[in-house]
Amino acid sequence: MEAMTLFDSPPILITGMSGGGLTSAAKVLEDKGYYVAHNIPPKAIVDLLKLCASPESPVSKIAAVTDVRSRLFPGSLAETLDELEQLDMKPTLLFLDARDDVLIRRFDSVRRTHPLQDGETLKAGIQRERAAVQSIRERADIIIDTTNLSVHDLRRAIEASFGEMGHELQHVTLESFGFKHGSPRDADLVVDVRFLPNPYWVPELRGYRGTDEPVADYVLSQDAAEPFIDHFITMFDSMLAGYRHEGKNFITVGIGCTGGHHRSVAVTEEIARRLRERGDLDVSTLHRDIARD
C-alpha cells in the first residue's frame, strides 16, 4: 500500500497485560514525537492507520494502544492484525508483560480492580487475561518483560528496540517568570537572576521589557551577566547529558527575576540564542509574566 510510505517509521501497536506498562510505553513514544491513540478498539485501528497515512495527514509517526478492555467492542485484535497484513500495513506489535505477582502488586498499589476481575480475586482476573492474550503475545514482534524494570529502564528498553528513536533532539523550554507570581510548577530547574541590577529602577527603561533592545543591552552589559550565562550553559550541558542518559528529552528551565518583565526575559532570550546557535537542541522560550502588572 503506497500510503504507508508517508510514515517516517512503521506504525507501532502497543498491547499486553494490564499493569504491564502500556501507559508508560505510550508516554515514551509520545516524547519521541509519535502521535499516540489510546484505548483504540481493534476494528478502528485499520481506519486510523488509513486516515493517518493519507496525503493530507500531518501525522508522520503513529502508535496505537489497545488492551483487554477492547473485548467490549466487536471484532478481535487477531482479526485486525490479519486485515492489516492483507493491506500491507503490518504494524510493529509491542507486547508488555510482567510476572503475575508483580502485576498484583501494581494493581494493589493504585487500588484498582482488574478489568477482567468480574467480582473474583485479582489473581483470577490476571490469569483470565493472560489466557485471553496468549495468542497475541505469540504474534508480537517485540516483547518487553517489565517485571524488574523501572520507568527509566522501560524507556531505555523501548529506545533500544526501536533504534534511532533515541537520537532525536532534546527539547528545552526556557521560561522567564517573576518570583512575586510564584515559580513555574513544571520547571525541572529554576534559576534566580535577581542578583543583576534591575532596569525597573532606571526611569527611561521602566516602560520597556526584556525583549526590547534597550533593556536587553542594559542587562547583558552588566559585569556579572556574561560570566553567569557562560557558567550556566556549561553546567546545563552536563545536566542535559544526564537527562539524555535517563531518557528525559523534554526539559523546562525557569529563569526568574522580581516581576518577570526585564532581567529574566533578557537572560532567557540570550541563553536561548546561544543554545540555538549550536544546532543540537530544539529550544523554545516562554515569557510567562511579561504582560502582568
UniProtKB/Swiss-Prot annotation:
Disulfide bonds: none annotated. Keywords: ATP-binding, GTP-binding, Nucleotide-binding. SUPFAM superfamilies: P-loop containing nucleoside triphosphate hydrolases (SSF52540). It comes from the Bacteria. Coiled coil: none annotated. One of its GO terms (molecular function) is ATP binding. GTP binds at residues 67-70. ATP binds at residues 16-23. InterPro entries: P-loop_NTPase, RapZ-like, RapZ-like_N, RapZ_C. The keyword ATP-binding applies. Belongs to the RapZ-like family. NCBIfam families: PRK05416.1 (NF003828). Displays ATPase and GTPase activities. This is Nucleotide-binding protein cauri_1197. It comes from Corynebacterium aurimucosum (strain ATCC 700975 / DSM 44827 / CIP 107346 / CN-1).
